[in-house]
Every structure is written in C-alpha cells, then in structure tokens.
Amino acid sequence: MTPSAASALVEKTPLETYVPPAKPSLIGLSRAQLCDRLGDVGVAPPQRKMRAQQLWHWMYVRGARDFSEMTNVSKEMRAMLAEHFTVDRPEVVAEQISADGTRKWLLRLPSGGDGQKAHEVECVYIPETDRGTLCVSSQVGCTLNCAFCHTGTQRLVRNLTAGEIVGQVMVARDRLGDWIDRETPNGNRLITNIVMMGMGEPLYNFDAVRDALLIVSDNEGIGISRRRITLSTSGVVPNIKRTGDEIGVMLAISLHAVRDELRDELVPLNRKYPLKELLQACRDYPGASNARRITFEYVMLKGVNDSLDDARKLVQLLKGIPAKINLIPFNPWPGSNYECSDWDQIEKFSEYVFNAGYSSPVRTPRGRDILAACGQLKSETEKLSVRERNALRAMAMTD
C-alpha cells in the first residue's frame, strides 16, 4: 500500500485547533523527539541521547514533576530545561472516591494561553483484588453519539495529544503514590492494566493514541505490558488492522447489537462500517488467537438487545473469531432512554453464551455513587458556579 493510500484510510473529524502552552511539556515525546527538542535548545549532539534517557527515566520511572527533582542532571542543565520546557501533566479539578474504592478524576488540560479555553477530560481507577485498571480518555468529548453513552451528549472539541493521554496515567500514579521511591523500589503496582475506554473514540485519534501507548508500554519507563492494555473501538474499521500492526495491544469492540438495524441506532458508526465489515476486520486482526482473544463489549439494555434470540445470533456472528464477550449492565444516567436488563435475564444470556464456548463475564458495576457513567462527572461539574468549581478544585488538591 502506498503512503497516500494508507493516509487516506485514517478517519478525520472536525476539531478545534490545539494551541500548545508557551512552555511545552516534554511528556508524550518519543526518545527521538526528546533528542530533537534538546537539540533545539542547544544541547550538543554527543549528549542528546544520554540526556534524553535521563529525562525518560525521571519522567516515566520516578514520576518527577519538576526538573529540580532530577538530581543526576547538572544544575545548569536543569535550569536550561526549566527555562524552555515543563514536565506538566493535567491538573486535577475534581476527585470522587466511591464506597467500593473506585476513583474518578476530572482533569484540566494545559491551555495555550488566555485566549484558549482550558478543556477537561475524565479518567477512572478501578481497584480489584488481582489488578488495578485505569480507564483513559482519548478525546475531549466524542463525535459518535452512541445512544446509551453519556459522553455522546457532549460535542467533540478536539483530540488529545500523546502527552495528555500519557499524562492521565501519570496523574493517577501521582494520586495513588504508585511511583518508585526509596520506600517502594519496585513501585506499589497499583495500576496494572490500562483500558482506552474513556471519553472519545481512540481510533479517530490514532497517531496520538499509538504514540502514548508505546510510551506507557515501554519496559524502561511506565512498563505496562501490551497484553495488559486494551483499546476499545466502536468500529473504525480502517484503523483496526493498524492497531494490531503498530501498537500491538489487546482489542475490544463496542458491539452492543447483533443486527445492523439496531446497531445503526445504538452505535451510529455502524451505518458507515456495518457488522459484516467490522467482524471481518476482527477476523483479520494481527495476533488474534486463543491466548489473545478479542473482547466484545455488550451493554445489556432491557427489552432492546437482551433476548435469548440475541444471544444465539451473537454466537453465530462471532464464529471463527477468538473472542470473549463482556456483558455490561447498563449504567443509568440522567436523561437516558434505556434501562438495565433484569439480573435474571443477564444471567440467562450469559449462560447461553458460555455454554456455546465463549467466556462471558458480567462486568461488576463500579462507582455508581460517584457519577460513574462516562462523561457524567464532566457534565455535572459544568453546571456548577465558578465558586463551587473552585471549591471542588481545592478539595482535589488536598491529599
């Protein structure tokens, strides 16, 4: 495939122009890009690779928030770096902690100056007995308008940069005390898994998501295995194969319906990439095997997609795909037109799929007491007055 043909496959959405801060953050740059930035400010070529590696270690292993913490870098070099760059990550505007331990953060992104509105996104930490999963956003808002999703009620503003995506992981480690230090030389390992299931469609922001996940999975940095990173897409078919080839993470498909006419309603992207095309892309996904199964997410909507006939059709659709099915009880949010399926019906659906040979875990609802529907915390805080938002921000800054 020619470069021009490949680029033609990349989906585009109308976006607000991103204006970087006056002093850009080094978070989210590759090693080669770090070397280039160091060259821009006069670091001699023989030193660039070594200095870039020092920065990489301090940013992604130690979690340094300021150049002054980088004690094996000379004072002169630290001063020069601080003059031109930062290692800023997003700012915590609000934090909600659920009774079940789930944490949700509303994060303000660095803006390009007084003339640009500071945008906000969410990320969520879900602790479990055997893992800790961080749900990360890829866009400010979303363009897909999925009928059951709260983020779909918010217009797409812009894509996140690689640094803003990596920054969410770093903020979570900051808040959880999950970096390496003298007391915890191997880290606490509270964040073991990453899921790209927050605000936005990751495959409509492919380049930034790819660059961010390559940093997050780098063994000499944050070091989360690619087998513990899952990218969820609503079905941007042209970029599914690229995900396997260029990122190599686990794939999840927001399926939610087994017939095109219903999926057209629930996931409007289906009108562009119908089920036949989507499932063929899954069959062709690089590296898919019984050891690296594709997850199909299926939100359980009462009287809409939860019949045993739907379960039978689901099994037929997935024939030949190394798959597991993640059944998701619908998480209600104000203004939604749907209800969660009855628990007995969810269990019957799960049992049928399991007996057909597919793993069919039912996702345990988490954090319902802290505005857990994706996008809901952002929507609720936008209704607050400036004084109330400042109070939330002050509370979030208090550990």
Swiss-Prot record:
SMART domains: Elp3. S-adenosyl-L-methionine binds at residues 200-201, 232, 254-256, 331. Keywords: 4Fe-4S, Cytoplasm, Disulfide bond, Iron, Iron-sulfur, Metal-binding, Methyltransferase, rRNA processing, S-adenosyl-L-methionine, Transferase, tRNA processing. Its cofactor is [4Fe-4S] cluster. Its EC number is 2.1.1.192. InterPro entries: Aldolase_TIM (IPR013785), Elp3/MiaA/NifB-like_rSAM (IPR006638), Methyltransferase_A (IPR040072), RlmN_N (IPR048641), RNA_MTrfase_RlmN (IPR027492), rRNA_lsu_MTrfase_RlmN/Cfr (IPR004383), rSAM (IPR007197). Disulfide bonds join 135-374. GO terms for biological process: rRNA base methylation; tRNA methylation. It holds the Pfam family RlmN_N. Residues 128-371 form the Radical SAM core domain. One of its GO terms (molecular function) is tRNA binding. The active site is at 122 (proton acceptor), 374 (s-methylcysteine intermediate). Binds 1 [4Fe-4S] cluster. The cluster is coordinated with 3 cysteines and an exchangeable S-adenosyl-L-methionine. It is found in: Cytoplasm. GO terms for cellular component: cytoplasm. It catalyses: adenosine(2503) in 23S rRNA + 2 reduced [2Fe-2S]-[ferredoxin] + 2 S-adenosyl-L-methionine = 2-methyladenosine(2503) in 23S rRNA + 5'-deoxyadenosine + L-methionine + 2 oxidized [2Fe-2S]-[ferredoxin] + S-adenosyl-L-homocysteine; adenosine(37) in tRNA + 2 reduced [2Fe-2S]-[ferredoxin] + 2 S-adenosyl-L-methionine = 2-methyladenosine(37) in tRNA + 5'-deoxyadenosine + L-methionine + 2 oxidized [2Fe-2S]-[ferredoxin] + S-adenosyl-L-homocysteine. [4Fe-4S] cluster binds at residues 142, 146, 149. Belongs to the radical SAM superfamily. RlmN family. Specifically methylates position 2 of adenine 2503 in 23S rRNA and position 2 of adenine 37 in tRNAs. m2A2503 modification seems to play a crucial role in the proofreading step occurring at the peptidyl transferase center and thus would serve to optimize ribosomal fidelity. Reaction proceeds by a ping-pong mechanism involving intermediate methylation of a conserved cysteine residue. This is Dual-specificity RNA methyltransferase RlmN. It comes from Rhodopseudomonas palustris (strain ATCC BAA-98 / CGA009).
